[in-house]
């Protein structure tokens, strides 16, 4: 039996749908249960999918919420993921985002900014999906990334170096997209989306796995290498940053574990047409899921992908 690492990257609400479809397609094709992964790393949307995977609830019913119609489904999801709150924290934003950003302009200018949505809804959503596990931590190695707003560094919940917290709180912190969600406080420190540091943080596999792994599966919704027709300008920025970070991480993995096989799954143009331009669109969850299944029917059949899946997961 091969030892396996599973890396689930960020990508918003539609990115989570992409990862749901990818893991379910792989399970149907190979019989492999993603919860059998020796180590799972989740960032932002991938953190939610990591929690669902460790709860062994990776099903179509979990994604759709059961027998809801389209309107009911959207309202149901919005109650959790787009829960309104009064924007606060202007002083925090000036100190930790705006002023540092003026010295070095970039995406970090948004850090700590006032936001319209309450990340407590994300924690509640994780409990809704994963059940009691959301209030605990999985026994199997599970790492959830977030960005420490005060120290401006990546924190890996589930590791010895991070403060103890529940899985639900860690996922909320990892998913607190700047200017969309308020930061999440854990032990008195504010955290924002782990994607600020990297959309995947795949290098954490070799830093935290007990032994070299045979196979690493990386699902990266925000690291597309293709261009979408009529894409918004920011789509290319996010994908370029995601791809550059992932490329560096893959180089580290290859240099450290040269014998380890790696498969990276990125969305194609048809998937992106549903998942973009708004990755936070609840309405596009099911269309993204369905297009991903169609895409993966072709992608998994490619010999360079299927041969490795069959060797390590079947």
Language-model regions: role of each:
Residues 1-43, 48-314:
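Patatin-like phospholipase
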